[in-house]
């Protein structure tokens, strides 16, 4: 008697979860994981693996691509150039990491784009990750804050509620006897994925009980711009974009003496907070396309041509500075 494919997939998932639980638990103890192991994939069952890609676009296309909200404006000009050069139609959807993950798991996209390193649950059978580059995650305060530089340990204390008043922070610039309560703003997106805000504190439970949590990028920047004593975080492109579009002005801090706008410090690993920008392709089987491979190769090769306003340090520069890769995927910081 043949076991139903759904039951088989469920059993495979249980076995898979058991095999990685010890490794995952030990990583959790370290806190602030930047990456997951590239050799582990989540089981989806034979029926799923045999499926090809079914596009859900309004009209027929050669490739369907879903990108997160920072890769979308950064890569669309390159994708358009590629499509014109090859005489093909490529549909590009502007979304989030979650939307990309959903379309990939539903076999509805030839390529996905993420602003985070993959979670274990993103590692689908046959799916390959290719790193475009990384972008600094800047710590931001209200413009009235006299602080210019912060140690990453002190930053963790601010978000973790271990430092409750800016006057408690050494070299904060606040005069003796002056009190300014810390108002930590957090956007806890992509909780299952490593890196990004989890390089500050590894889980939402590590953040202080009195943080103000926001769901949208614009709310993060706006709240910090309007709230004396506030501290938050965001990528440089979103900070600059919202200053132009909505007038939200914030102060950007250096961390451990390195400025987030210093691409050399980021590439050398001296600036410690960043997002990883990845795209995906299907390696084999019915979902694989040579055109998808060609597009990925083109985007990686042209990553250095992405406009500077997007503040992405390309993978080629990371390789030159000792970051570790498996094939095209960034998997570890430099030693």
Task: Identify the meaning behind each predicted range.
Residues 8-19:
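Bacterial N-terminal signal peptides
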Residues 24-335:
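Flexible loop/hinge segments at secondary-structure junctions
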